[in-house]
């Protein structure tokens, strides 16, 4: 049984396949079509030291769909706690209130440190620029469901590859499967070299127009304004990394566009109605995947 | 007869073949600080047939534990240890890098939880050695560091 879920690197291919298979079994429940109360009497503690809407809500939905309860600490409450209490103490206290903790924290490694101080399982919901393993699992689940397989996929990762924790987690997991990976980003936001070195997969930098007709998945991330020294530079870069329905004209029919959301303007609304858009489906898949993780650590 | 740069010790630990210029870092790793009661002698840039130049540290009256001594391999993988009893070498060995070190290195990532003030946390690193060069990876944030001399806390 999985004790904590801190980094995608803690899981092997077999663990991932197991969680994805379990998630599939929960899909009817996630949609509310079937009732299942296997976590009745259990309490999940949501500790969000940084704002989050969808991750926090989808954990809450996952827990409630399985009959469990949730207690929440929001970023606002966290900031008042932070004035006087260490993370170690907060975790020691809250782990006495619940059966598992979900944590999002601005510092890298905070989830691992939380796990070391917790008497209940800890699930990492994002620690700074570090890891976001539940997002990675739902991304893999989306690829598997929508493309029918994980092995043999050609995927392009596009946008902010330097700071995006989603990308850093995802690329490690993609390397466990037989995938060809293209990296599409402005030079200033390229994937850090040490991550490329660590990943034993076929990886190549490319431009979208070179690979659009070849790829099975286009994974887009937000380019954050605050990463740029001036707004002019940001506008130049972000403008060239914007997907429209037109951009996708030469894509394969089966090619899917994914995005961890929220999007700003990197995917034009015209893409939403194309056969390629899967980002809303992807965010729904967060529920069955998180149900699988919660049931795994709590039962 | 060659003159000894540092006098012989009766009992204690001699750390030889330290990379030239690293003796002070060795003391730091062993947590021997100003104000110590120990008798410590140190020689820097001593001519060496094998290494060209080397440093030597002698700590009198104390047998330092192997796991502490092995941490020296992080900055000086060729270092040798002589444990001296009654002016004779009782045991001699080469340091070998530990797989995990706690509380020796400091993570350069300011956003790493191991640098958070007031948290009861000890930095922890996993060590990898290739061709006599050690690199380390932070247990908490995963940051990989080379040239470990720069990160001794």
From Swiss-Prot, chain A:
Subunit structure: Heterooligomer of catalytic and regulatory chains.
Family indicated by similarity: Belongs to the aspartate/ornithine carbamoyltransferase superfamily. ATCase family.
GO molecular function, one term: amino acid binding
Pfam families xrefs: OTCace, OTCace_N
Key words, A-Z: Pyrimidine biosynthesis, Transferase
Gene label: pyrB
Binding site for L-aspartate: 83, 165, 222
Pathway: Pyrimidine metabolism; UMP biosynthesis via de novo pathway; (S)-dihydroorotate from bicarbonate: step 2/3
Annotated catalysed reactions: carbamoyl phosphate + L-aspartate = N-carbamoyl-L-aspartate + phosphate + H(+)
Top enzyme category: transferase
Native organism: Archaeoglobus fulgidus (strain ATCC 49558 / DSM 4304 / JCM 9628 / NBRC 100126 / VC-16)
SUPFAM superfamilies (alphabetical): Aspartate/ornithine carbamoyltransferase (SSF53671)
Keyword Transferase (UniProt): yes
E.C. numbers: 2.1.3.2
Residues the record lists as binding carbamoyl phosphate: 54-55, 104, 132, 135, 261-262
UniProt function note: Catalyzes the condensation of carbamoyl phosphate and aspartate to form carbamoyl aspartate and inorganic phosphate, the committed step in the de novo pyrimidine nucleotide biosynthesis pathway.
Intrachain S-S bonds: none
Protein's GO biological process: 'de novo' pyrimidine nucleobase biosynthetic process; 'de novo' UMP biosynthetic process; amino acid metabolic process
Name of the molecule in the record: Aspartate carbamoyltransferase catalytic subunit
Curated annotation (Swiss-Prot), chain B:
Domain of life: Archaea
One BP annotation, GO: 'de novo' pyrimidine nucleobase biosynthetic process
A GO term for molecular function: metal ion binding
Keyword annotations of the record: Metal-binding, Pyrimidine biosynthesis, Zinc
InterPro entries found in the cross-reference section: Asp_carbamoyltransf_reg_N (IPR020545), Asp_carbamoylTrfase_reg (IPR002801), Asp_carbamoyltrfase_reg_C (IPR020542), Asp_carbatrfase_reg_C_sf (IPR036792), Asp_carbatrfase_reg_N_sf (IPR036793)
The record's free-text note on cofactor binding: Binds 1 zinc ion per subunit.
Binding site for Zn(2+): 107, 112, 138, 141
Gene3D superfamilies noted in UniProt: Aspartate carbamoyltransferase regulatory subunit, C-terminal domain (2.30.30.20), Aspartate carbamoyltransferase regulatory subunit, N-terminal domain (3.30.70.140)
GO cellular-component term (any): aspartate carbamoyltransferase complex
Cofactor annotation: Zn(2+)
Reported function: Involved in allosteric regulation of aspartate carbamoyltransferase.
Family: Belongs to the PyrI family.
HAMAP family, alphabetized: Asp_carb_tr_reg (MF_00002)
Subunit structure: Contains catalytic and regulatory chains.
Protein name: Aspartate carbamoyltransferase regulatory chain
């Amino acid at each position: 049984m999985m004790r904590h879920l801190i980094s995608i690197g803690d899981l092997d291919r077999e663990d991932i396949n197991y969680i994805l298979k379990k998630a599939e079994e929960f899909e009817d429940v996630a949609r509310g079509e079937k009732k299942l109360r296997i976590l009745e009497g259990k309490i999940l503690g949501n500790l969000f030291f940084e704002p989050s809407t969808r991750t926090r809500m989808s954990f809450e939905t996952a827990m409630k769909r399985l009959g469990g309860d949730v207690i929440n600490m929001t970023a606002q409450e966290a900031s008042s706690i932070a004035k006087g209490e260490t993370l170690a103490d907060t975790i020691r206290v809250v782990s006495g209130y619940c059966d598992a903790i979900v944590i999002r924290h601005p510092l890298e490694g905070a989830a691992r440190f939380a796990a070391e101080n917790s008497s209940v399982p800890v699930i990492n919901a994002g620690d700074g620029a570090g890891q976001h393993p539940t997002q990675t699992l739902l991304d893999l689940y989306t690829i598997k469901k929508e493309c029918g397989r994980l092995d043999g996929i050609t995927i392009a990762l596009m946008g902010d590859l330097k700071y995006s924790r989603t990308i850093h987690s995802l690329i490690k997991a993609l390397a466990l499967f037989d995938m060809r990976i293209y990296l599409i980003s402005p030079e200033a936001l390229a994937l850090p070299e040490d991550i490329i070195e660590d990943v034993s997969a076929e990886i190549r930098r490319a431009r979208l127009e070179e690979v659009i007709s070849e790829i099975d998945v286009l994974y887009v991330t937000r380019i954050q304004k605050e990463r740029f020294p001036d707004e002019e530079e940001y506008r130049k870069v972000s403008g060239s990394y914007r997907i429209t329905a037109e951009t996708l004209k030469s894509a394969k029919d089966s090619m899917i566009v994914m995005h961890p959301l929220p999007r700003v303007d990197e995917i034009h609304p015209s893409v939403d109605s194309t056969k390629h858009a899967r980002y809303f489906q992807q965010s729904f898949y967060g529920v069955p995947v998180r149900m699988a993780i919660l049931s795994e650590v709590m039962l | 007869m060659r003159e000894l740069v540092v006098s012989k010790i009766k009992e204690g630990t001699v750390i030889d073949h330290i990379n030239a210029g690293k003796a002070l870092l060795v003391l730091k790793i062993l947590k021997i600080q100003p104000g110590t009661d120990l008798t410590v002698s140190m020689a820097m840039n001593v001519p060496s047939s094998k290494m060209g130049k080397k440093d030597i540290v002698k700590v009198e009256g104390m047998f330092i534990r192997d796991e502490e001594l092995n941490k020296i391999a992080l900055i000086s993988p060729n270092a040798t240890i002589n444990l001296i009893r009654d002016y004779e070498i009782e045991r001699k060995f080469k340091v070998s890098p530990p797989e995990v070190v706690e509380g020796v290195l400091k993570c350069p990532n300011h956003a790493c939880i191991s640098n958070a003030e007031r948290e009861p946390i000890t930095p922890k690193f996993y060590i990898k050695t290739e061709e006599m060069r050690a690199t380390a990876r932070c247990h908490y944030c995963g940051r990989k560091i080379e040239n470990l001399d720069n990160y001794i806390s």
